[in-house]
Amino acid sequence: MKRTNYAGNITEEYLNQTITVKGWVAKRRNLGGLIFIDLRDREGIVQIVVNPETAATEVAEAADKARNEFVLEVTGKVVERASKNDKIKTGGIEIEATAIEILSTSKTTPFEIKDDVEVLDDTRLKYRYLDLRRPEMLKNITMRHATTRSIREYLDGAGFIDVETPFLNKSTPEGARDYLVPSRVNKGEFYALPQSPQLMKQLLMTAGLDRYYQIVKCFRDEDLRGDRQPEFTQVDLETSFLGEEEIQELTEELIAKVMKDVKGIDVTLPFPRMNYDDAMNFYGSDKPDTRFELLLTDLSALAKTVDFKVFQEAEVVKAIVVKGAADKYSRKSIDKLTEQAKQNGAKGLAWVKFEKGEFAGGISKFLAESTDSFVNELKLTDNDLVLFVADSLDVANSALGALRLTIGKQQGLIDFRKFNFLWVIDWPMFEWSDEEERYMSAHHPFTLPTKETQAFLSADGHRKDSDLKKVRAHAYDIVLNGYELGGGSLRINSRDLQEEMLSALGFKLEDANEQFGFLLEALDYGFPPHGGLALGLDRFVMLLAGKDNIREVIAFPKNNKASDPMTQAPSIVADKQLEELSIKLANKDQ
C-alpha cells in the first residue's frame, strides 16, 4: 500500500479516514486486552490500537508478534483518542488497525532508541544507524539540512556561483598536518586532501567568477576536541572587488536569514565589532564570549608598588573579580582553578577575598597597606573574590581567559538562550609559535596586510622578527558565544607583495616557487582585489542545536582517536595494494 503520510503527521485532519503509515515500533503495550503500538518515523510517533477480539486474525497475530524496532506497514481508520496526549502532535488521534504487515524484524538493540539514554559514545558511534533513529538526533540532522538550504537560498539570490574545487591537491606548508593520498600513477608522489579550498577559490576570482561559494568537506590531521573533526564542512565564500565591511555586511545578512529560517530569531544588525587587542586584553581570548561580563583588568602599575616579588618581576599583573562569590570558593576549589591556570601556561594563581572591608586569605598580607587602592581600582564590594595572574601578557590573558569561562559556567553567569555574534577585527598578521620557534601567519600567508604596516614586511636585509609583530592584517573572524564561527580576510593580489609575505615566513624564493608557483604566476595575469570568508557549518549547527560537540550534528563522525567504531576505519590494507602504490611500511609488526 502507498503511504498516506508520515506517522508523525497524522492529526485530526485525517479523522474517520482510512490511511496507511509505515515505520518502526517505538513501544508495544498489551493493556486489558487491547494492544497499543507506538509507530515512529522521522516526523514523530502515532499510536496504533488493535483489539484482538474484533480484529482480523492476521492483524491480531501481527500485533502480538511485533516488538521494538520491527518495521511495520499499518492500515487503519483514524479515530479520536479517548485519552489525549498533548505532548505530541498526533496526541489527539489513534489508528484502529485493519491491516498490519511486518516488513522487517529486529534483534534487541544495544541501547534503547530514546533521547535520554545512557550509553558510551563509542557504542553510539558503532551503531550510529540506530543512534540516528533517536528523535533528538533526527532533529539535529534535519536542522543541519534546514541550515544548508537557507544558506544556499541566500547565496544563490546574492549572485554567488556554486563551484566544486578538487579534493586531490598539492600538499603545502603553513597549516595543520595534511591527510596524504599516494599516487599509483606517479610513484613516490602524494596528493593532499584540502584543509580548505583557499588557493582554488582565489584562482576562481582571477578567472572572473566574481562571487563563488561552496559547502565543502575539508580535512585536517590535528588533535581532536569537541568542536573539531578530521573531516569537517565549511561554507566557503570568495568575492571580487568588495571591501572588508561589504563582506562582513553580506555575511551578517546570510547569518540573519539562517537564524530566522532555522530558529525563528530576528538578530540585530550590524554585529558588534571588537579589535583583536581588546578581545585579548579584556576577555583573554580571540573568540570572546560576550554573553557575560567578568572582564580582565590590568593592574600592572598598581601591583608593582606592592612588596610582593611575584608581582614586581612579572611583565604584567592582571585580575578578574568574581562578584559576591568569595564564600562559594573553598581553598580546594581555588586549587582547582590554580591547576587550570597552570595548564594554560601560568606559573600560579594568586588570590584574595574581600570581606568586611578587608582582604582575607591568599596573598592578603601583601596587599594590606594598599587595600583602598585595589578596592577602588577593581570596584570591589563585600564578598568579592579576586584572582591574579602575574606573567607575560600572552600567558596572563590566556590563563585568565580560560578561568573566566570556567567561572562563568560555575556561577551561572551565562545566558544559554542568547546568540551573541561578534566580529573580531584588526588582527596581527603574524603570531609566535613556540613549537616552530618562529613567527607564523595568524590566518594564512595570503592575507592582505594593511597599507600602514606593509613596510615592516620589507626584505631589504634590515627586517627583524620584532618588526613582524607590528604588521596588521585585513582579517576578520566572526564569533558566536565564544566559538570561532568563521574567519576571513582580504587577499594579496600583487606578486611582489605575496613574495614579500612568503619571505617573511622563511620561504626562499625557489621554495616559494616550488610550493606556490601556480599562484605566483597567476598573480602576473590581472588578479582583481578580492576577499572572502569561511564559516564552520558543523560548529554553527552545533550552536543552533544547543550542543557542545559537533559529533551531535554530523551523521557519521569520528571519535576522539579519529576512528570510526562502526566501519573500523582507518584499517590495515592488503600488501598488494601497498605494492601497487610503491609503499613499504616501516616497523610493520610493531
Swiss-Prot record:
GO molecular function: any one? nucleic acid binding
Please give the InterPro entries that the UniProt record associates with this protein.
Aa-tRNA-synt_II, aa-tRNA-synth_II, aa-tRNA-synth_II/BPL/LPL, Asp-tRNA-ligase_1, Asp-tRNA-ligase_1_N, Asp/Asn-tRNA-synth_IIb, AspRS_core, GAD-like_sf
Q: Which SUPFAM superfamilies match?
A: Class II aaRS and biotin synthetases, GAD domain-like, Nucleic acid-binding proteins
Name its GO BP terms in alphabetical order: aspartyl-tRNA aminoacylation
E.C. number(s) listed in UniProt: 6.1.1.12
Binding residues for ATP: R220, D221, E222, Q229, E484, G536, L537, D538, R539
**Entry keyword set:** Aminoacyl-tRNA synthetase, ATP-binding, Cytoplasm, Ligase, Nucleotide-binding, Protein biosynthesis
Where does this polypeptide localize?
Cytoplasm
**Family per similarity comment:** Belongs to the class-II aminoacyl-tRNA synthetase family. Type 1 subfamily.
Q: Describe the function of this protein.
A: Catalyzes the attachment of L-aspartate to tRNA(Asp) in a two-step reaction: L-aspartate is first activated by ATP to form Asp-AMP and then transferred to the acceptor end of tRNA(Asp).
The protein's name is: Aspartate--tRNA ligase
- Tell me which species this is from: Lactococcus lactis subsp. cremoris (strain SK11)
